[in-house]
Every structure is written in structure tokens, then in C-alpha cells.
Amino acid sequence: VLGKVETWWKDKCKIVPAIVPEAAKMPFYSTWYSYHQNIEEKQLERECELAAQMGFKGIIVDDGWQTDDNHRGYAFCGDWKPSETKFPHMKEHVAYVHSLGMKYMLWVSIPFIGKNSGIWKKFSDKLLEYQEDMNAGVADIRYKEIREYLMEQYVDLVKNYDLDGLKMDFIDEFHEGAATPEYNENMDFRDVQDALEHMMVQLYEKLRELNPDILIEFRQKYVGPYIRKFGNILRVDDCPMSQLSNRVGLVDLRILSGDTAVHSDMVMWNKAEEPEGVAIALQHCFFGSLQLSVRLEECKQEILEVIRYYMELTQEW
């Protein structure tokens, strides 16, 4: 019955899902839980060497690549240029990861214009709201100028560094609230959601022109039939070290996601975890593609053997 619902969305509502490349269904290594913002290119290259040997087919480089600041928050979002300290040779770095047989995806926070970003002065008066706890404002995409700027940043990232995809975070922050300015004549959309759909459809088309197999990830809380129009990877919401939440999240996503790739939240564990505990965590991801986020260089050999066994098992089945 639920399968028919997914078909109904596509056939009757004309909500056609994005193309799902084979790479979207492969296991990925993620930097978020293992490193947070403390990342740099040589360190990640060593991790990728180990990950590739185990069968991981891609890396998702999360928050931190765009700033030297490691204090969390989103004050430096908006410019979307690699940190010259952490990633001084970004293009060569991506090429090296490609040479290992792995895809390369970068995290971007779509809505945030950070107060410490270079673009802040230009767009600080075109915000849906300012979030003090984030040290950033939410871009008002009812302005064509804002949409074009955001799209240009993401297209340039993919083009300039030969990226295979983007992890697009916080899309749910695009909404109207008490602080949202009223519509004015300089806007070409009245409704934020209409502007968002228009931008995302355009962006997906632009990215596919660069790479027909572009990978786009969104996570739970902002998933549904419409998000599948421009996203081909749907991930379980953040649930670090919660095995049951990961399994339930995978099942929930699989029920109505059709052919769209479904990924686990990034699996992690305590450094003192026994092999049996690691095995249980990995087993809970059997219903989708694995994302892993532990420092492989620091794992004991017996832990690496468990990961390798799991990877071989999932590739077989």
C-alpha cells in the first residue's frame, strides 16, 4: 500500500524524484562526529586511504573546511571558500581522494549568512531572521539576488574543485516567523516556500549540467516527496551512538523513499568499545547505506577487522 503512495506522488502529483546514481547507494565515510570542525587535508587523506581499503566509496567532509575557527556556530558561513590553512591545496586534495576510488562531497549550510562572513555587510538587511545562538542570519530567498548568490556559490564549489556532491544542511530554516520582514517590491516571491522550491529546482539543474551524477544529501526532519525532486540521498537524523534510533530511522525513510538512497546517521562509538559493541552498531544499519564517523587511524586492529567484515558482508548482499 505504501509503495502505491510513492507511485501516486510520482504519477498523479508529477513529483518526479531526482536521478539516483549508483554511488549514492554506496557506504560513505563522514568527518563530522570523528573530527567536528578540526579537519585538514593531509589528515583526511590518510583516513581516506584506510577507508578506501575497507570498501568505502566516498567521503563527506562536514563543517570546518570553510573556516579556521573551531568554536562551532555558523558565524563564518556564507562565503563558501576553503580555509587556506586547513585546505591550501583543495583541488589537488580532492583529486587525490578520487585517485583512491572515492567520491568527494562537501557540507554546506544553505540558509546561513554568518555575521563574520565577508558577505555579511551586503546581505545583512536581506534576512528572514537573525539567530543569535547561531551567530548567523537566515537568507531571505524571496530576493532574486539572494537566490542567485547562493546558487553561484554551490555551482562554483562543484566546478572549481571537481566535487561529486554536496551535503545540504538546515534547509528547514527557510521559513517565515515573527521576525520575518513583510513582502516588498524588490522581492520577486511573496512566499518563502515557493521561492525555496524555485531555487532548489534551478540549482539541481545547474549542478546536473556540471555532473549528471551529482550527489545531494538531505537529512530527516526535512524529507518527503518534494525534497526527492532535488535530493538523491536521504539520511537518518542525528542520533550519535543510538543504535535503535538509527535502525528505526532507516526503516521509516525506506518505507516512502522509493529508489532514493537511504543512509544511516554517522555510526560512531566510544574509543574503549569492544568489537562486539561495534558489530551491533553496524548491524543496525543493514536497512540502508552506511555512513561511518570514527577516526580509523586510531582504531585497534580488531575493530578495523569488524568494520572490514561488515563492509564485505554488505557488498555481498
Language-model-detected regions and their locations in the chain:
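Short acidic/histidine-rich active-site segments
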Residues: 167-174, 216, 220-221
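Alpha-helix-loop-beta-strand connector modules within alpha/beta enzyme cores
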Residues: 87-102, 188-211
